[in-house]
Amino acid sequence: MSTLLLVLDLIGTFVFALSGATAAVKRRLDVFGVLVLSFVVGNVGGITRDLIIGAVPPAAISDWRYLGVSILAGMITFWWPAIIKRLWSPVLVFDGAGLALFAVSGTQKALAYGLNPVMAALLGMLSGIGGGMARDVLLTEIPAVLRTDLYAVAALAGAAVVVIGNVLHFPSVAVTIAGAILCFALRLMAIRWGWRLPTARQPDQSTRE
């Protein structure tokens, strides 16, 4: 399980870092800004998770591989942006992949540290949405989790699959893959078809008068 968590964490860090770097390039940040954003976006969710469950120091600052994959993602995006631009909505695709991977890896790590299933699922969701929130805040945007298509709900759904599979003693690898696929699919379908949670209805001008 430790190997699976490490692989998921590193892949999730890489794709989230790609989303941060891509957003930075679109905003025409310099190379330092791109690398900073790629590291922060790629690692803030995992750092938050590790601090909450007491896994200190967090893996992102104690294992050089996290810094390495973050810098690699930033440099690829900075020097070869044309490769990234060929993808459909690259920021959204990378963000969805990072969301899915961190949601399931965060849930698995929370379970491994003894959290109950409900709290493990919530922490998995928090791990997933952390990177996207950091990216949007640093770029002075309202975080996607607060304003757009299904985001946190997709992460929670993927985390729930992992938790249910763990309770039913299904193979960890299978439920982790299933949870990640569900989360990623929900996120992309929400983007494609505009699925979103209800928003508060604003009173009409005539009603206020």
Question: Where would I find each of the regions flagged by the language model?
Answer:
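C-terminal ends of transmembrane helices
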Residues: 17-27, 50, 75-88, 133-144, ...
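Short, structured motif recognition centered on aromatic/hydrophobic residues
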Residues: 36-40, 47-53, 122, 126, ...
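Small-residue-rich segments of transmembrane alpha-helices in multi-pass membrane proteins
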Residues: 38-46, 94-108, 126, 150-163, ...
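Structural signature of hydrophobic alpha-helical transmembrane segments
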Residues: 1-13, 39, 58-72, 116-128
